[in-house]
Amino acid sequence: MNEQVKTATEQTRELTDEEVRERVIQLAFGGDRERFDMFVSALREALPADVTVVLRGSAVIGVRWEDGAPFDADGPGTSDIDLTLVGGDMLKLWSDDAFYIPKFHTAPLNDETPNHCPSLVPLRRALCRIAGRAVNLQATSSFLQYARDVLMDQPFFTLIEGTKDDADQPEPANGARS
């Protein structure tokens, strides 16, 4: 992790949920709260209630993880939105060859990989239209989501908190965006 990313990560952890939400609206939705609300509504309508939807990456911390460049550094609409679907039966929707960690963490669904999860392609296309930029979807287990936050120090913002059936699920680390 380079210095810009480290600093942005530390600063993000100090923000309130509302401040992170406002950052996301400014960066990813050009300040248009109505488009942000439509985006979240589209997710709520399309996904089961037990699925948590997490936003990661430069839309949350303001810089790219790889090189520390600012969000949309290459021009308006050039940065993507990275969503992770946690829980429910989301992992079962991905094809067997679309996993980074079999049965625990998928590769992203994007323009180049529509066969990873054909059933979510219409949702992804709708989200791209609403956001006016590329949207990547991944699925992960709740344990791996927890590990990414705690072990890898990757901030996230919870767009939708899924209903919980299992009281034994790990809680986010102190200071996690949730």
Identify the residue ranges that each predicted region occupies:
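Catalytic core of pol beta-like nucleotidyltransferases
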Residues: 2-79, 86-178
